[in-house]
């Protein structure tokens, strides 16, 4: 999350707000590194994993975080020198991008992904609105990390590392601390689960738990070969992506061409990170980067995963990897929503029956930003009228307006219980229906809430291969307001 000091807020506060200790992480600047992971979140933190070959991960504390915090605040993820590696990234579309976004965008434009071997990131300072000096700090951070990645070399190696910042805006990076900390960071590089989990901790700000996922997969062209993918991510507030909200670093040992990697990442981001929202604010620092080194490729075969932009159909490997990557990145993105500031509910919104995926996704995103709906869910009220209200205005002023996409007489709204029983209808073809209040109450007591909006309820049973737009969000609580309003003592 990125915060800019709000001068004067403390002068109008009559009394300090109460914030539970495990949320006093970034607003109070003094406890994230010293606070335990809340019991309700511990199940989301893996105790082991399967990590891609040929990647080294390291983290260290260089003093960007306040005194007394020992958690890492500088991390580096890099492919070993012997592997031919490429990179890709999706970046925020916010008109006030942080220096890291500008520098990484320039690297991608210059390299077209070829030769990109690593990602360096820091927490606690967003390096936002810091002018040309801030840009030079980001460039220096990238160059110094590049020297480590290339084995203290020069030239291309110095322009091989993408850079990320997260934290407070309006402050200069402690670039001297960072550069002086690189030798220790290099010594801390390794391949174990502990290395990965510490790197995930190193990019946390208001997060209450580190976010890490990994899995193995195969490709149709070499079903006997097992590939791996791993990713770390962060975020708990200022979440409504348009990349491209959050930071994410993903690595795979599958062999992929640079243009294919960028296409795969962009498509997957559109159906994962770009489908989450907490409060509807798009960050200035959003970035998800991906590296592929082919280290697990059979017989040293390089780059079998490719695509032809002019082809009507892609290769089987491309299609299989795309499907896997969408699922994997969705898992990472959902961890961000699980950690939404003050959240008590994880909400899935499914929109069915839209003529196109973009139209359905837009509708789902509007519902996900509805304060009335989200506060209603916090109060354990399904609030179907709130869903319909958001649905009704969702297309106003958009390219989808006036095309008959929403027809009240064919629109139904239901909630899907987590126990696998039949969905519970609240609206049927534009009319409220009588519901089983006992069942409805039980449904809203659950942590996970799933809403289904069917724009073309024609009685046909929904099939799994039918396309739908899915969005993930959380409730808005008293705690959320308190956390973001706590600028007192």
Swiss-Prot record:
Active site annotation, chain numbering: 245 (nucleophile)
Q: For this protein, what is the EC number?
A: 2.3.1.35, 2.3.1.1
Offer an example of a GO molecular function term for this protein. glutamate N-acetyltransferase activity
Q: Where in the cell is it found?
A: Mitochondrion matrix
**One GO location term (cellular component):** mitochondrial matrix
Give the transit peptide, as a residue range: 1-11
Q: Where is this site: Involved in the stabilization of negative charge on the oxyanion by the formation of the oxyanion hole?
A: 166-167
The entry's family comment says: Belongs to the ArgJ family.
Tell me the protein's name: Arginine biosynthesis bifunctional protein ArgJ 2, mitochondrial
Which organism encodes this protein?
Answer: Sclerotinia sclerotiorum (strain ATCC 18683 / 1980 / Ss-1) (White mold)
The organism that produces this protein has a lineage beginning with: Eukaryota, Fungi, Dikarya, Ascomycota, Pezizomycotina
């Amino acid at each position: 999350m990125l915060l800019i000091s709000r001068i004067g807020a403390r002068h109008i506060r009559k009394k300090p707000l109460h914030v539970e200790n495990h949320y006093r992480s970034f607003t109070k600047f003094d406890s994230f590194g010293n606070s335990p992971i809340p019991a309700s979140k511990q199940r989301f933190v893996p105790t082991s994993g399967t990590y891609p070959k040929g990647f080294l991960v390291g983290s260290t504390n260089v003093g960007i975080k306040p005194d007394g915090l020992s958690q890492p605040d500088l991390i580096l993820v890099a492919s070993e020198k012997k592997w031919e590696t490429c990179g890709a990234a999706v970046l925020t579309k916010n008109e006030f991008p942080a220096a890291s976004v500008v520098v990484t965008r320039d690297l991608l434009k210059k390299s077209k992904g070829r030769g990109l071997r690593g990602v360096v990131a820091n927490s606690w300072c967003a390096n936002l609105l810091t002018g040309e000096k801030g840009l030079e700090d980001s460039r220096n951070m990238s160059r110094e990390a590049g020297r480590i990645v290339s084995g203290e070399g020069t030239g291309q190696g110095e322009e091989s590392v993408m850079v990320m910042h997260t934290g407070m805006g309006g402050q200069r990076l402690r670039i001297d601390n960072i550069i002086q900390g690189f030798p220790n960071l290099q010594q801390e590089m390794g391949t174990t689960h502990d290395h990965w989990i510490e790197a995930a901790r190193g990019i946390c700000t208001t997060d209450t738990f580190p976010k890490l996922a990994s899995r193995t997969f195969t490709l149709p062209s070499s079903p006997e070969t097992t590939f791996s993918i791993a990713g770390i991510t962060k975020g708990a507030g200022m979440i409504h992506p348009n990349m491209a909200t959050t930071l994410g670093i993903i690595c795979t040992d599958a062999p992929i061409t640079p243009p294919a990697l960028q296409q795969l990442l962009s498509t997957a981001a559109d159906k994962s990170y770009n489908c989450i929202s907490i409060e509807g604010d798009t960050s200035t620092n959003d970035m998800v980067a991906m590296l592929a080194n082919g280290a697990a490729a059979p017989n040293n075969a390089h780059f079998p995963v490719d695509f032809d932009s002019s082809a009507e159909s892609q290769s089987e490997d491309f299609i299989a990897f795309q499907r896997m990557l969408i699922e994997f990145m969705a898992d990472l993105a959902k961890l961000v929503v699980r950690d939404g500031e003050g959240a008590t509910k994880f909400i899935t919104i499914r929109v069915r029956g839209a003529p196109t995926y973009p139209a359905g996704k837009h509708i789902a995103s509007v519902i996900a930003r509805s304060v009335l709906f989200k506060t209603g869910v916090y109060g354990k009220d399904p609030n179907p009228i709130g869903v319909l209200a958001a649905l009704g205005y969702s297309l106003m002023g958009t390219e989808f307006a006036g095309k008959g996409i929403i027809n009240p007489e064919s629109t139904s709204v239901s909630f899907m219980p987590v126990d696998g029983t039949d969905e519970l209808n609240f609206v049927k073809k534009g009319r409220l229906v009588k519901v089983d209040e006992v069942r409805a109450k039980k449904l809203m007591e659950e942590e996970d809430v799933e809403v289904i909006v069917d724009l073309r309820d024609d009685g046909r049973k929904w099939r799994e291969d039918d396309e739908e737009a899915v969005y993930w969000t959380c409730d808005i609580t008293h705690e959320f307001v308190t956390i973001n309003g706590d600028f007192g003592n």
